[in-house]
């Protein structure tokens, strides 16, 4: 489905709805809208996809572009499986 190769880091924006919970567990920066941005280590795109998707619409991968593409691909596969 997607390659295991990736960058060493991913940047994820968490929604204001879960920002406080994430901030209690991770180092990052708040944005003006209340969202929270974290740079996570990323050894494998598959892990990154699973990590971001577990938060549904409350998380957005900002980088690397390969991760964003892999998430889109995973979502297309899910949509096709659901008919």
Question: What is each model feature region?
Answer:
Residues 1-83:
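Polybasic (Lys/Arg-rich)
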């Amino acid at each position: 489905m997607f390659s295991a190769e990736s960058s060493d880091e991913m940047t994820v924006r968490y929604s204001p709805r879960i920002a406080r919970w994430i901030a209690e567990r991770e180092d990052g920066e708040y944005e003006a809208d209340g969202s929270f941005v974290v740079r996570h280590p990323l050894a494998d795109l598959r892990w990154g996809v699973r990590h971001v998707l577990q938060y549904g619409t409350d998380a957005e991968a900002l980088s690397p572009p390969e991760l964003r593409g892999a998430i889109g691909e995973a979502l297309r596969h899910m949509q096709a499986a659901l008919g």
